[in-house]
C-alpha cells in the first residue's frame, strides 16, 4: 500500500473493529462444541490463563480460573498504564470469557500442597498460568523446575506430572502479553488433546507467537 500513499496502521484497525464490536450490545461470541463433561482448573487469570480458557471453553471443556487477586487480568489489570489499556475495555473482554462459560474463583491463591493436590483430584487437567513462580513454590507443589520456571515441554506446556500443564511466564519470562496469550492457546490445544486421548502436539503449527492467534 505504501507504493500508492501511506501504510495502514493494522493494529489500530483491529482495535477499532474490536471497540465497535464491544459497543454493539451483542459482542461476538464463538460457537462451542457440545460439553464434554471434562473440567479444567486454571491457576492464574492473566493473559495466558484467560486465553487458555477462551479456547478450552470452545472445545466444550468446563473451566474454573483461580487467582489470588480480586480482579482477573493479571498484569493487564494491575500493571499496564490506563492510557495504554482502559480498564473498561479489558473488563468487557473478560466478561466475554465469562459469558462463554468460565467460572472465576478470585481472592483464592493456590499455595499449599494440599490445595494443589485437591485441584488435581477434582479436575481432569490443571493449567498453571500464574506468572513467574518462585522455586520454593514449585517445591511445595512438587513440580520439576527449570530456570526460570516450571520444566515443561516447550511445544505443548505439558509437565512431567500427569494432567498438569504450564504456560506463559510460569515457564519462561515473557514481557509481551501477546506472547503469553499465544502460550495459553497452545496449552489449551494440548490439554484438549490430552483430555480426548489424542497425541499431544499443542498447536504450534497454527499459533503465531507474534499475534497470538
Per-range role (PLM):
Residues 1-5:
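Local cysteine-cluster metal-coordination motifs and their immediate loop/turn environment
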Residues 21-40:
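A short, basic/flexible loop-to-alpha-helix module at the beginning of a structural domain
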Amino acid at each position: 500500500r505504501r507504493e500508492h500513499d501511506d501504510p495502514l496502521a493494522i493494529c489500530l484497525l483491529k482495535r477499532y473493529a474490536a471497540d465497535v464490536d464491544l459497543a454493539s450490545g451483542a459482542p461476538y461470541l464463538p460457537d462451542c462444541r457440545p460439553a464434554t463433561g471434562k473440567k479444567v482448573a486454571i491457576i492464574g487469570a492473566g493473559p495466558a490463563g484467560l486465553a487458555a480458557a477462551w479456547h478450552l471453553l470452545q472445545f466444550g471443556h468446563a473451566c474454573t480460573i483461580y487467582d489470588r487477586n480480586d480482579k482477573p487480568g493479571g498484569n493487564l489489570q494491575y500493571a499496564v498504564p490506563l492510557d495504554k489499556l482502559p480498564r473498561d475495555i479489558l473488563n468487557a473482554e473478560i466478561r466475554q470469557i465469562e459469558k462463554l462459560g468460565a467460572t472465576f474463583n478470585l481472592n483464592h491463591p493456590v499455595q499449599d500442597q494440599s490445595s494443589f493436590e485437591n485441584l488435581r483430584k477434582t479436575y481432569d487437567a490443571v493449567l498453571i498460568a500464574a506468572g513467574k513462580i518462585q522455586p520454593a513454590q514449585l517445591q511445595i507443589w512438587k513440580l520439576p523446575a527449570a530456570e526460570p520456571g516450571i520444566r515443561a515441554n516447550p511445544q505443548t506446556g505439558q509437565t512431567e506430572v500427569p494432567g498438569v500443564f504450564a504456560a506463559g511466564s510460569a515457564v519462561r519470562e515473557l514481557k509481551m502479553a501477546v506472547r503469553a496469550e499465544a502460550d495459553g492457546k497452545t496449552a489449551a490445544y494440548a490439554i484438549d488433546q490430552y483430555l480426548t486421548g489424542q497425541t499431544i502436539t499443542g498447536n504450534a503449527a497454527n499459533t503465531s507467537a507474534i499475534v497470538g492467534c
